[in-house]
């Protein structure tokens, strides 16, 4: 088996039985905020696109690159389709001309039979509202000699099926770096922002190392990030200095952490690097550049590399911005009322979970999303808000023009906004913004309405707690860490006060906990 990095979470997996192109992203995403790092625009995308199978893990725009898929990927390729609760991924791929779909069942091994041989594959589908745009997934591929687990940026909660269905995993590709807007966009004191950033930077790497320990693969490829920020107003987000609060550490930083914790087998790959495996044996690792130049991209030459990359991509960035809607136009109150109020009326669990009005400051306009009243309105004089966003009007007008069903997958991941809040993170609020269609909101609201099993118990540091995390049902025997009277689930970094089970991260999500 040959595994070639095509950038970010993208890989070409080549076997005697056929090739699988995974998450081929090259064009800037999220209002031209994110670019692949290192640069992958020089790869031969026409050749890469002549694949037998296509796997797109989910619809986030750093995985689903519609322009690249349309222009370069063989439309007769068989699409390996995750078992998602809504059909959006299949629908979007069909719009691009793909017509051959292999529908998988969540966490079930399937055999792909082709003219050149057979492959065993399994797609672990994640279906919680917090998983991607209503769906994220991870892919296992076995060719009879070698088994690869491409986890990209998915966060599976139960990996026992890997060993039961495939035995030993030979190579594991996974995310370890940041892919979020927190804490950078929030209005808070610099000292607090630095503390939260440093905490997040470390927790996301701790989570990745826990996954590595669980999977137990011989070889590990850190991937699926970080992105590169080339717009002048966003360049400070790159981890090209020595800021311990930067949430976007690169592969070299994580490989050092792996080694420091006794985890060997980490492989550094850049776009165009190819690793050849036979079972647990790494036959070769070839890079498009000498090894010392590859490492320098992440170390001594990183700032200069990003500066040169920004110069090369300046025309691309300008062309992207030219495609945005104009900032000026008709008042936005009525278009936003037309968009949001029907969704509010279908989502009692989510609106009640949000629990308060939210302010949208869009240029000169202030618009209130009054979730308790299921209404979009103007503010009341001297009204104060627990949560608010300041978003440039051209971004809002663009997503309205394009009928975007997901503001997380467009505006929020761009980091081109400001936010403020009183109290903790509100998961229901961001879920609302990613569910702006009837199908999505119906699924998400129903998901929150279901009762989750908390009957099984474990003991951690002298506390008896429910085994499954109240947030997304992670196994707390694997992801739970107790410090004093605080439990942290490292899957998403949520915390609970063990004295009374109160969630310290968001409303609701009560934990059952006691001293035995």
UniProtKB/Swiss-Prot annotation:
One MF term in the entry's GO annotations = 2 iron, 2 sulfur cluster binding
Q: Which residues form the Rieske domain?
A: 429-516
Entry keyword annotation includes Metal-binding:
yes
Q: What is its EC number?
A: 1.-.-.-
Cofactor, how bound (note): Binds 1 [2Fe-2S] cluster per subunit.
Q: State the source organism's domain of life.
A: Bacteria
Which keywords, in A-to-Z order, does the entry hold? 2Fe-2S, Iron, Iron-sulfur, Metal-binding, Oxidoreductase
Q: What class of enzyme is it?
A: oxidoreductase
**Binding sites annotated in the UniProt record for [2Fe-2S] cluster:** 469, 471, 489, 492
- Quote the record's miscellaneous comment: Was identified as a high-confidence drug target.
Query: PANTHER family of this UniProt entry?
Result: N-ACYL-PHOSPHATIDYLETHANOLAMINE-HYDROLYZING PHOSPHOLIPASE D (PTHR15032:SF4)
This chain belongs to the protein called Putative Rieske 2Fe-2S iron-sulfur protein Rv3818
